[in-house]
Design a protein with these regions (language model features):
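Helix-loop junctions that connect tandem helical modules in alpha-solenoid scaffolds
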Residues: 44-63, 93-116, 152-164, 200-210, ...
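Generic preference for well-ordered alpha-helical elements
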Residues: 66, 116, 143, 168, ...
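Flexible helix-coil junctions and inter-repeat linker/turn elements that act as hinges
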Residues: 71-86, 99-107, 122-141, 155-159, ...
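Long all-alpha helical scaffold domains
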Residues: 166, 172, 180-181, 200-208, ...
Length: 348
């Protein structure tokens, strides 16, 4: 059996020396080596990235530091749990710096700012290595962040392709965390407008071909879980989603819709999901009817959605009879597995 690949040697360690072998290799597999040096480099990077009117050579050095940070942290891609004891020290400094930047200049900050792009790039790298769900826990989650982050995201959206793709992705994840904070979004016209603005800008990223679509699905899934938003906004989303499934020529948009529903069905309150289950199943039906076999990513998420819907219908105690809809979703899963087998056979 082939041996598992070991992390690349750390700077300052001669691969040919005695210290680079044996127990040192085992240590690299069981701890975050050179953490102090890494955190020192991160501090230098943040300071350089946020320098006002930095000359070209400082900006070049900032990029070099970012590339080195990314190279060093990518070593732990396959054993990312080793980073867990240090995640707060890793994620909080760039996240807090981003928070300060956005809070003080959300209406004036250039969406193409090199500082904004650099900070979001580093946060994306951490989410890639350790997973967005875990890294998101260390993003600021204060009510005061909602409006500044939303304003900046709207300006980023208006700027289009000139903005680094990591920027909208991180802002969408950040807003998704803020949406989980227990504060009221009902009662005032202003609050209702904020909720509508969040939904509108997040929906606009669902047809994206990149990570922004993933961030948008997470944000919408969490927004629709809020009691004051779910009652009217989620049914309207389902109606819109069925129309887009039938009419949209974009497989990316279909994927984004299914991703959003997967988030909602997995994490929403059981009674709420069951209340809208038939409508969600209608979207799934349209996904099968209009997209089956045309896109692997669409197939993946419709299969995931069918599985989650079936789980939501399973009773907590042994029933006298099983809901017929469970059989329908299980049949959909079996068909998807059969379809996957055909794909594997023909591509072998």
């Amino acid at each position: 059996m082939a041996a598992a690949a070991l992390p690349a040697p750390q700077p300052g360690l001669d691969p040919g020396s005695d210290e680079a072998g044996g127990d040192a290799e085992l240590l690299e597999l069981t701890s975050f080596a050179h953490v102090d040096e890494y955190l020192a480099l991160q501090r230098e990077f943040i300071q350089a990235a946020t320098s006002v009117d930095a000359p070209d050579h400082i900006q070049a050095e900032t990029q070099q530091k970012l590339q080195q940070l990314e190279k060093d942290i990518n070593v732990y891609q396959e054993q990312s749990y080793l980073l867990d004891p240090y995640l707060e020290a890793l994620v909080s400094p760039p996240a807090r710096t981003l928070q300060q930047l956005v809070r003080t200049a959300s209406t004036e900050l250039d969406p193409t700012s090199s500082a904004l792009a650099a900070l979001c790039r580093l946060l994306y790298v951490y989410s890639k290595v350790r997973g967005y769900k875990i890294v998101s826990r260390f993003l600021p989650h204060e009510v005061g962040d909602l409006l500044p982050a939303l304003v900046l995201l709207e300006r980023v959206r208006q700027s289009g392709s000139r903005v680094s793709w990591e920027v909208p992705y991180v802002l969408l994840l950040w807003l998704g965390i803020v949406c989980l904070v227990p504060f009221s979004l009902k009662g005032g016209t202003h609050d209702e407008q904020v909720a509508s603005r969040i939904e509108l800008v997040a929906r606009s990223y669902l047809p994206s071909s990149g990570k922004a679509r993933d961030g948008a699905a997470v944000l919408l899934g969490r927004l629709y879980r809020r009691e004051e938003v779910a009652g009217s906004a989620f049914p309207a989303f389902l109606t819109w989603a069925r129309g887009r499934m039938r009419e949209s020529g974009s497989q990316f948009e279909r994927t984004g819709i299914l991703q959003t529903l997967c988030e909602m069905v997995k994490n929403g309150e059981t009674h709420f999901v069951q209340q809208h289950l038939d409508s969600v199943a209608g979207v799934l039906h349209d996904a099968v009817q209009f997209a089956q076999g045309r896109n692997t990513l669409v197939d993946r998420f419709r299969t995931k959605l069918a599985g989650r819907l079936a789980l939501r219908l399973l009773p907590t105690q042994a029933p006298a009879a099983v809901d017929d809809r469970v059989d329908a979703f299980v049949e959909e899963l079996l068909q998807a597995l059969q379809h996957q087998v055909r794909i594997d056979i023909t591509s072998a």
